Amino acid sequence: MNNIQKGIKEDFGIEFANQDLLLEAFTQGNYLNEHPEEKGRDYQRLEFLGDSVMQLIVADYLFTRYPAWEEGQLTEMRIAMVQSKSFSHFARLAGFNRYIRLGKGEELSGARNRDSLLEDIWEAFIGALYKDQGAKAVFTFLNKAFFPAIDEGFFEEFIDYKSKLQELLQKAGSVDIEYKVENEDLSDPQKPHFEVTVFVNDKAIGSGSGRSIKIAEKRAAKKAYQDVTPR
């Protein structure tokens, strides 16, 4: 068992039947140039596959979990979830940067922690897991390492509902939009909680809560935007 397989098994309980796929997912092209004795490929083909797999699995997850959401809501969240900035974040959380096989020059340049490479490696791993074990295994992995971030408000960072709400409301003319903190609970410093309501011309149109005022405001804007968007 190679070190990559050992780490992935310890962290996620995943054991690849085809360990060559796993090595390929973590192999950068310059590494192969410096190790001509290795006959494998770099990660790029698996990255191509993983991109499509992520699109499908995330779309299916959202479709199943949110039966009341309209197509526009599903699309907005899917776009937020499958963009590259989120992939680099989760690749770091999963510790994937430890396993990348880099050429010496890339190692010295700091590529191991480069967002663009980590984004690619995340997709390549997803592609490798799909080829080795199928969509169900990918879903199980994402359910542990990716989907919980929805409830943590992580992906809302990539959807600017405050701007979307402002643009929608101002189509009818000038309006006064205000966000007010209605309640806050700081009893547990590790789990602060804020409740925010958004007002338009002194009328409440949406509320939201979260671990920070910023997240609560975004959720209030999201609720208001979804309620006032024409169906």
Curated annotation (Swiss-Prot):
The active site is at 51, 123. Coiled coil: none annotated. GO terms for molecular function: double-stranded RNA binding; metal ion binding; ribonuclease III activity; rRNA binding. The keyword Transferase does not apply. Gene3D superfamilies: 3.30.160.20, Ribonuclease III domain (1.10.1520.10). InterPro entries: dsRBD_dom, RNase_III, RNase_III_dom, RNase_III_sf. The gene is rnc. Belongs to the ribonuclease III family. It is found in: Cytoplasm. Digests double-stranded RNA. Involved in the processing of primary rRNA transcript to yield the immediate precursors to the large and small rRNAs (23S and 16S). Processes some mRNAs, and tRNAs when they are encoded in the rRNA operon. Processes pre-crRNA and tracrRNA of type II CRISPR loci if present in the organism. Its EC number is 3.1.26.3. This is Ribonuclease 3.
